[in-house]
Swiss-Prot record:
<feature type="disulfide bond">
    <location>
        <begin position="14"/>
        <end position="43"/>
    </location>
</feature>
<feature type="disulfide bond">
    <location>
        <begin position="29"/>
        <end position="61"/>
    </location>
</feature>
<dbReference type="GO" id="GO:0005576">
    <property type="term" value="C:extracellular region"/>
</dbReference>
<keyword id="KW-0646">Protease inhibitor</keyword>
<dbReference type="InterPro" id="IPR002350">
    <property type="entry name" value="Kazal_dom"/>
</dbReference>
<dbReference type="Pfam" id="PF00050">
    <property type="entry name" value="Kazal_1"/>
</dbReference>
<dbReference type="InterPro" id="IPR036058">
    <property type="entry name" value="Kazal_dom_sf"/>
</dbReference>
<keyword id="KW-0722">Serine protease inhibitor</keyword>
<feature type="domain" description="Kazal-like">
    <location>
        <begin position="8"/>
        <end position="63"/>
    </location>
</feature>
<protein>
    <recommendedName>
        <fullName>Acrosin inhibitor 1</fullName>
    </recommendedName>
</protein>
<keyword id="KW-1015">Disulfide bond</keyword>
<keyword id="KW-0964">Secreted</keyword>
<dbReference type="GO" id="GO:0004867">
    <property type="term" value="F:serine-type endopeptidase inhibitor activity"/>
</dbReference>
<feature type="disulfide bond">
    <location>
        <begin position="21"/>
        <end position="40"/>
    </location>
</feature>
<feature type="site" description="Reactive bond">
    <location>
        <begin position="23"/>
        <end position="24"/>
    </location>
</feature>
<comment type="function">
    <text>Strong inhibitor of acrosin.</text>
</comment>
Protein backbone atom coordinates (compact mmCIF):
# COMPACT_ATOMS: atom_id res chain seq x y z
CA UNK A 1 0.00 0.00 0.00
CA UNK A 2 1.32 3.42 -0.92
CA UNK A 3 0.88 6.14 1.66
CA UNK A 4 1.19 9.82 0.86
CA UNK A 5 2.21 12.10 3.73
CA UNK A 6 -0.03 15.17 3.99
CA UNK A 7 1.52 18.30 2.52
CA UNK A 8 -0.10 21.52 3.69
CA UNK A 9 1.52 23.66 0.99
CA UNK A 10 -0.14 26.23 -1.21
CA UNK A 11 -3.49 25.29 -2.78
CA UNK A 12 -3.54 24.40 -6.48
CA UNK A 13 -4.03 27.12 -9.07
CA UNK A 14 -7.31 25.93 -10.57
CA UNK A 15 -7.15 28.43 -13.44
CA UNK A 16 -4.59 26.27 -15.26
CA UNK A 17 -6.84 23.21 -15.60
CA UNK A 18 -9.24 22.42 -18.39
CA UNK A 19 -12.07 19.92 -18.25
CA UNK A 20 -9.87 17.02 -19.37
CA UNK A 21 -7.80 15.53 -16.55
CA UNK A 22 -5.05 12.93 -16.62
CA UNK A 23 -5.33 9.69 -14.68
CA UNK A 24 -2.20 10.26 -12.60
CA UNK A 25 -2.59 9.60 -8.89
CA UNK A 26 -1.31 12.50 -6.85
CA UNK A 27 -4.05 12.78 -4.20
CA UNK A 28 -5.45 15.97 -2.78
CA UNK A 29 -7.82 16.29 0.20
CA UNK A 30 -10.61 18.87 0.37
CA UNK A 31 -12.27 20.60 3.30
CA UNK A 32 -15.03 17.96 3.36
CA UNK A 33 -12.45 15.17 3.80
CA UNK A 34 -12.93 13.86 0.25
CA UNK A 35 -9.86 12.60 -1.60
CA UNK A 36 -9.46 13.51 -5.28
CA UNK A 37 -7.03 11.64 -7.51
CA UNK A 38 -5.15 14.81 -8.49
CA UNK A 39 -5.33 18.62 -8.57
CA UNK A 40 -7.24 18.65 -11.85
CA UNK A 41 -10.10 16.48 -10.57
CA UNK A 42 -10.31 18.62 -7.43
CA UNK A 43 -10.37 21.84 -9.46
CA UNK A 44 -12.96 20.53 -11.91
CA UNK A 45 -15.26 19.57 -9.05
CA UNK A 46 -14.80 22.98 -7.48
CA UNK A 47 -15.32 24.99 -10.68
CA UNK A 48 -17.80 22.93 -12.71
CA UNK A 49 -20.17 22.01 -9.91
CA UNK A 50 -19.95 25.32 -8.08
CA UNK A 51 -18.96 23.24 -5.08
CA UNK A 52 -18.27 24.92 -1.77
CA UNK A 53 -15.08 22.97 -1.17
CA UNK A 54 -11.65 24.21 -0.29
CA UNK A 55 -8.14 22.83 -0.38
CA UNK A 56 -7.08 21.11 2.83
CA UNK A 57 -3.82 19.35 1.97
CA UNK A 58 -1.99 17.30 -0.62
CA UNK A 59 -2.21 13.59 0.13
CA UNK A 60 -5.07 11.28 0.95
CA UNK A 61 -7.64 12.34 3.51
CA UNK A 62 -7.49 10.46 6.78
CA UNK A 63 -10.74 9.01 7.98
Amino acid sequence: EIYFEPDFGFPPDCKVYTEACTREYNPICDSAAKTYSNECTFCNEKMNNDADIHFNHFGECEY
